[in-house]
Design a protein with these regions (language model features):
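Active-site lining segments of carbohydrate-active enzymes
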Residues: 380-448
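Inter-helical turn/loop segments and adjacent helix faces that build the functional surface
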Residues: 381, 448-452, 489-497
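Carbohydrate-recognition beta-sandwich/jelly-roll modules
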Residues: 2-392
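Well-ordered alpha-helical segments within folded domains of soluble proteins
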Residues: 298-320, 360-379, 429-444, 475-491, ...
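Short sequence/structural elements of tandem HEAT/ARM alpha-solenoid repeats
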Residues: 327-333, 387-392, 452-460, 496-504
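Positions within ordered alpha-helical repeat solenoids
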Residues: 317, 377, 399, 403, ...
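Long alpha-helical HEAT/HEAT-like repeat alpha-solenoid scaffolds in very large eukaryotic proteins
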Residues: 499-551
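Glycine- and aromatic-rich loop/turn segments at beta-sheet edges
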Residues: 205, 273-300, 337-361, 399-424, ...
Length: 551
């Protein structure tokens, strides 16, 4: 006797209702997909089917106390269907639109007007793959990516048996800001689930002996869901095809969104003001060994080489664009040599006189290579001093890469390669995208010297990251540099493989972006739309990581 499959009450109830049959309300088609709208006991559903290839059940409206009445309303614009659904707690208006200009998709928006101040202790998920006989318990497939933290509310999966294809579910969290404000909640990892119960789990106040009482207001229309569901006929594929498909499907969803209006900023004036502040503010700089160095943070932390090189590279770019000399940049460059370890032949993170509260031998893996990237940038622009430091550090950079098998830990001792921190959490993964950054540095070395062995090192690093799929992103800017490295390798070698591998880096990068405009807390005071969160599990955006990704 086979082992019973564990399932939630919601999944079992749906399975039973589909077997018995629901009350049909409407039907329309989307390519070879038929979409039946039906009323169950406590929900109204859209059942999307492909002939003999399975389907998908989408919960359009959850009705506490049961579905009292469903009426079809007049549609407007691109709407396929508009419904008014009544239940014990009030009225919900559901609109369904469709588009197949690039990839077929439907958009389902549900607006709830409660008849009384409504506490929401729980709302069920809204997406169920359907197997043979419309049974969600017989659906076989795999989730490739789901929402991380407060990033985009998406889940990307494929239904293999039956061969329905791939699905990208994208919850437009921007439309739900009123719901979050009324209930005092955040959509933290709200889109995901355990197969086959997937989709959006609306956030609710934490439950306890004395739970918060933050109701949805009576008589006020509040959007509780604005879901975009994109379909693709293909399902199982290698990581490159899967990544490209994800980007295509995400692009189809993105085109349906109302992006924030472009605002004018005088970036040139801001750049000049920032330069003045760096030069004049005593909190910005510190003197060591007779040289000027930039503080990593305002009036705090010891100077480190990554910060110095990032500032110098940016100042060089601005000087070239403005066609003017910036003496402050040259002043900073004069102190770079103190970071170079002549014995190890590498750029060290800290100056030799760093305080005892720091481990002068400890280095995060990406800190070893990011300064070299900016040195390479200056070297390729003709800076002889930068070239000397860059080329003088390449052998050690390669030695470290080979020692770790092109799979770097979080932190290690620079003199012995002793690992200090192996993994970011219990998944055993280190800084998974450092290989992309290393590859970019190796491509720079190849362009500077013409030596094929540097190109070979770049290839090895990219190859070592195969099959990381959506776990590739450790830190946003490193993933972005990895995508750029793949594109450089493609142009140099003319090998299609590297173009395809760039999609893996890009897919992992965009998986970690917030494609919505939050009005929660302090976020209401600034734009976060399409911002990249700094780390794979970070609940914040950082100016450096965002700007470096853009660069």
């Amino acid at each position: 006797m086979g082992r019973a499959i564990a399932a939630s009450a919601a999944t079992i109830s749906l399975s039973v209702e589909l077997a018995k049959g629901m009350r049909k309300i409407a039907q329309f088609s989307l390519g070879d997909r038929t979409i039946d709208i039906a009323a169950g006991q406590d929900s109204v559903w859209a059942i999307v089917r492909r002939p003999n290839r399975g389907g998908l059940a989408v919960r359009l409206a959850h009705c506490w106390g049961g579905v009292s009445d469903v009426a079809t309303l007049r549609t407007t614009g691109k709407e396929c269907l508009r419904l008014r659904v009544r239940s014990a707690v009030g009225e919900q208006v559901v609109t369904i639109g469709s588009d197949d200009m690039s990839l077929p998709l439907i958009r389902v928006t549900t607006v709830l007007t409660s008849s009384t101040p409504l506490l929401v202790p729980y709302l069920p998920r809204d997406l169920y793959p359907l197997g043979k006989g419309d049974d969600p318990l017989r659906a076989q497939g795999q989730v490739e990516a789901a929402q991380r933290g407060l990033n985009s509310g998406l889940i990307y999966f494929h239904l293999d048996r039956p061969a329905f294809g791939s699905v990208l579910y994208f919850q437009n969290l921007t439309a739900l800001n009123d719901y979050f404000a009324a209930t005092g909640t955040k959509p933290d990892s709200a889109v995901g689930g355990e197969w086959p119960e997937l989709g959006f789990l609306p956030p609710t106040p934490p439950q306890s002996g004395t739970p918060p009482t933050k109701p949805l207001p009576a008589g006020r229309a509040v959007t509780v869901s604005d879901a975009l569901i994109v379909f693709h006929d293909e399902a199982v594929a290698n990581e490159q095809n899967s990544a490209r498909r994800f980007l295509q499907m995400l692009g189809a969803a993105y085109r349906q969104l109302a992006a924030p209006a472009t605002k004018y900023h005088d970036w040139v004036e801001r750049s000049r003001r920032t330069l003045r502040n760096l030069e004049r503010a005593p909190e910005a700089t510190i003197r060591h060994y007779g040289h000027t160095y930039i503080h990593p943070y305002t009036a705090s932390e010891y100077p480190d080489v990554m910060v110095q090189m990032s500032i110098i590279s940016a100042l060089r770019n601005f000087a070239a664009w403005a066609e003017e000399d910036i003496p402050f940049s040259k002043a900073l460059e004069q102190g770079l040599g103190k970071f170079h370890d002549r014995k190890l032949k590498t750029m060290r993170r800290y100056l030799p006189n760093v305080g005892r509260d720091k481990d002068k031998l400890a280095v995060d893996s990406w800190y070893l290579y990011h300064p070299l990237l900016n040195l390479g940038h200056l070297a390729l622009a003709g800076d002889r001093g930068a070239r000397r430091l860059f080329e003088g550090s390449l052998d050690f950079a390669i030695k470290a890469a080979r020692h770790f098998g092109y799979r770097w830990p979080i932190q290690f001792k620079v003199d012995t390669f002793e690992v200090i921190v192996e993994a970011r959490n219990d998944d055993g993964l280190g800084q998974t995208d450092v290989g992309g950054l290393f590859a970019y540095v190796m491509v720079q070395a190849y362009e500077l010297t013409g030596r094929q062995d540097y190109l070979t090192e770049a290839r090895k690093a990219i190859d070592a990251a195969r099959n990381m799929r959506f776990e590739l992103n450790y830190q946003a800017n490193l993933t972005a540099w990895g995508a750029a490295a793949c594109l450089r390798l493609w142009r140099i070698t003319d090998e299609e493989y590297y173009l395809q591998q760039s999609y893996v880096y890009l897919a992992s990068f965009f998986h970690n972006t917030a494609i919505w405009e939050s009005q929660i807390g302090h976020a209401k005071h600034y734009d976060v739309f399409l911002g990249a969160t700094a780390l794979h599990d970070a609940p914040y955006m950082a100016i450096f990581e965002c700007s470096d990704s853009f660069a």
